[in-house]
């Protein structure tokens, strides 16, 4: 029996990166419309169930993101200060964890690439990377289920009406 995830979506253990997942989804809308929505992390909680809260942190390029994972009766919360560290309108965006304290923190990274397809819509690729030691098989299963739901919600957000329903 084959793995339920396609090869590109399987978690990979790489040197220097504990977890890396590639998520691909096709969306209706122009690259500019999709980019405008995906460049703001506050919008991500509309489709990603493991994002509990997102608050801006002194501007439009940094956010305090609270992640929440529940495995059975156990829940874990994790707060991250995420910063948009790179953007190339309308092709790509990269967010990275950038805490302001002097402590050493695990890396979190989200790289979004938007490619216009011939005809209508775009292909969007999101690469999520985490270098911390607290990842586990149960968390992987929770994350994967949220990703599958997020794909559907994203497609609904960018339905064939020509653009995002998020402002």
Residue ranges of predicted features:
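Hydrophobic pocket/interface hotspot
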Residues: 34-38, 44, 63, 84, ...
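Compositionally biased, intrinsically disordered linkers/stalks adjacent to structured regions
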Residues: 147-157, 164-167
């Amino acid at each position: 029996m084959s793995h339920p995830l396609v090869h590109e979506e399987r978690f990979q253990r790489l040197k220097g990166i504990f977890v890396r997942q590639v998520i691909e989804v096709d969306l209706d809308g122009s690259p500019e419309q999709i980019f405008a929505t995906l460049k703001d992390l506050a919008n991500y909680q509309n489709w990603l169930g493991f994002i509990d809260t997102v608050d801006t942190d002194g501007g439009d390029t940094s956010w305090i993101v609270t992640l929440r994972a529940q495995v059975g009766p156990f829940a874990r919360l994790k707060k991250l200060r995420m910063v948009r560290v790179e953007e190339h309108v309308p092709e790509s965006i990269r967010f990275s964890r950038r805490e302001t304290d002097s402590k050493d923190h695990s890396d979190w990274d989200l790289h979004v690439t938007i490619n216009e397809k011939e005809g209508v819509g775009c292909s969007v690729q999101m690469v999520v990377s985490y270098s911390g030691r607290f990842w586990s098989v149960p968390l992987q299963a929770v994350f994967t289920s949220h990703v599958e739901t997020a794909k559907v919600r994203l497609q609904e957000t960018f339905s064939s009406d020509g653009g995002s329903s998020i402002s």
